[in-house]
């Protein structure tokens, strides 16, 4: 049995992975919308956070406005994602689905990778 080395190096920012979907090809707009709809369909509260790429691996990200409690329109969530990206064009932007029942994050994904 051989062990495959993943070519990620601290010296190479492009090789760093963040969140589950970063190991897959970049998501299309339709795929991101499907993930937003998944969050909404489960009754989770969508929220958007952003951070400078150099601070992305610290614990604190800036919250974009408040979580969208009770939001049922995926397009409204995506409009806020776009507004966050326009206001913070060089930052990573992630979408979170807060699960009230489990009192935790049910989903957490990077929807825009910042410039490194």
From Swiss-Prot:
It is found in: Cytoplasm. GO terms for biological process: reductive pentose-phosphate cycle. One of its GO terms (molecular function) is ribulose-bisphosphate carboxylase activity. The keyword Ubl conjugation does not apply. Induction: Induced by growth in high levels of dissolved inorganic carbon and low NH(3) levels (at protein level). One of its GO terms (cellular component) is cytoplasm. The keyword Magnesium does not apply. Gene3D superfamilies: Ribulose bisphosphate carboxylase, small subunit. Pfam families: RuBisCO_small. Keywords: Calvin cycle, Carbon dioxide fixation, Cytoplasm. RuBisCO catalyzes two reactions: the carboxylation of D-ribulose 1,5-bisphosphate, the primary event in carbon dioxide fixation, as well as the oxidative fragmentation of the pentose substrate. Both reactions occur simultaneously and in competition at the same active site. Although the small subunit is not catalytic it is essential for maximal activity. Belongs to the RuBisCO small chain family. Heterohexadecamer of 8 large and 8 small subunits. The basic functional RuBisCO is composed of a large chain homodimer in a 'head-to-tail' conformation. In form I RuBisCO this homodimer is arranged in a barrel-like tetramer with the small subunits forming a tetrameric 'cap' on each end of the 'barrel'. This is Ribulose bisphosphate carboxylase small subunit 1. It comes from Hydrogenovibrio crunogenus (strain DSM 25203 / XCL-2).
């Amino acid at each position: 049995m051989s062990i495959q080395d993943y070519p990620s190096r601290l010296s190479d920012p492009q090789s760093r992975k963040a969140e589950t979907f970063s190991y897959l090809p970049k998501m299309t707009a339709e795929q991101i919308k499907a993930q937003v709809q998944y969050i909404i369909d489960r009754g989770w509260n969508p929220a958007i956070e952003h951070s400078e790429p150099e601070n992305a691996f610290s614990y604190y990200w800036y919250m974009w406005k408040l979580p969208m409690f009770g939001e049922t329109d995926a397009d409204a969530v995506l409009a806020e994602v776009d507004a966050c990206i326009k206001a913070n064009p060089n930052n990573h932007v992630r979408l979170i689905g807060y699960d009230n029942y489990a009192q935790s994050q049910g989903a957490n994904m990077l929807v825009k990778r910042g410039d490194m």
